Amino acid sequence: MTNNYSNWTFKGKTVKNIEDMQIHEPKVWGFVYLMSLYDIKTGELKYQYIGKKNIYSKRKRSFGKKEVASMKDKRGKKYEYVIKESDWKTYLSSNSFIKDNANKYKIKREILMFSTNDMDLKYKEAKEIICRGCLEDDFFLNDGASLRVFGKKVM
């Protein structure tokens, strides 16, 4: 597959690393993006997609046998959380149409807004999908919006 996608941009400026994001949001956790698909031959805008991407992944790592054996308190937790940078630089989308047809379109990847936590990120994505009318228009490839919010945990 050839690389038909652009670098990520935010307000017209290229975003190449996390430091470029931290200029706008020092405690950035992820972003909401707009992906625009242009016909390679005509340059005509065909589809758009709103999505979200975490720039870090948080994984649960279980301790090995030696680590567990060296623990003073055997009743303690036998795992730790590891946070590392995600694949955001080369990320195309979770949308199957975009992944399957990426070589047929020139793809522009634009960051719309940054977020500092996962709950805020989910809220901003759902709000953007609903406010832009993505679910009512075939021009957008979005299939749905999902959000569960309890209390004042957002923002």
Residue locations for each model-derived region?
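Structure-specific nucleic-acid interaction/processing domains
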Residues: T2-M155
